[in-house]
Amino acid sequence: MNQDLTKGSIIKSMLLFAIPMILGDLLQQCYNIADTLIVGQFLGRNALAAVGSSFTLMTFLTSIILGLCMGSGALFSMRFGEGNEKALRENLCASFFFIAFVTVLLNILSFLCLDSLRIFLQVPLEVWSDMHFYLFIIFLGIPAVFLYNYFSSYLRAIGNSVVPLWFLAVSAILNIILDLWFVIGLHLSVGGAAEATVVAQYVSGIGIAIYTLTHFSQVRSIWNIHCLKKERIHEIISFSTLTCVQQSVMNLGILMVQGLVNSFGPIVMAAFAAGVKIDAFAYMPVQDFGNAFSTFIAQNYGARKNDRIRSGLKSAVCISMAFCIVISALVFIFAKPLMSIFVDANEIEIIQEGVRYLRIEGAFYCGIGCLFLLYGLYRALGRPGMSVVLTVISLGTRVVLAYILSSIVGVCGIWWSVPIGWFLADITGLFYYKAKKKELF
């Protein structure tokens, strides 16, 4: 079902569009969490540390593809809002070839650089063997990440957030079943967890590609070389590259912090691995709502409905902040039971450190909720450069403070650097909005 976000109730249209996206990402988090949970409970702390560190690296690599697809998706939304089908077809063709090229290049580089990662990430020797094996298999799934994100970006741009949910649901269920079978039944260690994830990724990627190509004639223009226009290639590169930079800078900062975390040893690594999964799961709905809000703004910006944009912005802030307050309270109260899901009850030190992490981060989710709205707003209004600026402020602050504070107060300094970065970026983004409001829309 395609949804025109330029008409009807603002709150209803945003929520109806956002809910399938939120459910889809919940499922995606489920098959990320499946690896962590099963590995943590059945393979021990070193395996958990290996999978956790690998997840941070893979998040960085896939963020490059995700950023390119998100930037292209914003352009698709604008063209859909304008009703310009010719430009939409040309954007689809240009973006497909460009992002496919980047994906192939990224996949080759990831294998070539695999052996150098231990030094860069400061991975302890007792963890590296499992991590190397896990990453080698996971890298095979990078093309599947491209397929899913490219075709889902088109579907969401035209207001269809339900179909991507279907394919993620199948993928998530399959991943969990295969995780249990490969790790517990066949005793395949961390390699089994990686294989389960890769198989699930290809099921969702190939499935959504076949569906979209079959049901939407516009998308079949990606094979039409006559739709590959030079000006559209430049447009896609200039627009999506900035969104890619935003996503990759954000995750590069996290990756740099991962290296610092690794220097504190397997206990802190394992606590961070579990805590990050819970953290991402907790604020993921406001991240998805920010992406849905971005599509809403982009469609209405293309249709030149500025009053609807202003009303939508006010509604989005209220919805996002209300959710953040609720989820902050829940994470703060239930931090210990949440950590116990991922870590054996006998690993007291890991649980204690994870609880400390969650309570510091969870108390300030309103900061990240506001930041996701600002990212979505500036991307939709054709100002992805501002999203990059906010990301650099947020992550730059996080990295610098993490190294400074950890040398003074220990590992807690790393945890405190995160919310400080969020709020500095929020302040910058809000000041820019106030100063440029009349120019934006």
Please state what every model-predicted region is:
Residues 69, 137-156, 164-172, 193-208, ...:
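Short runs within selected transmembrane alpha-helices of multi-pass transporters and secretion channels
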Residues 21, 25, 37, 74, ...:
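Transmembrane alpha-helix boundary and packing residues in multipass membrane permease domains
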Residues 16-35, 137, 171, 200-204, ...:
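Transmembrane helical elements of multi-pass membrane transporters/channels
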Residues 1-18, 76-141, 185-241, 297-364, ...:
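Short alpha-helical transmembrane segments in multi-pass integral membrane proteins
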Residues 48-108, 145-164, 271-335, 368-382, ...:
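Small-residue-rich hydrophobic transmembrane alpha-helices
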Residues 30-49, 118-125, 181-188, 248-277, ...:
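Helix-terminus/linker motif at the lipid-water interface of multi-pass membrane proteins
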Residues 7, 11-30, 34, 57-64, ...:
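Residue-level signal for short hydrophobic patches within transmembrane helices
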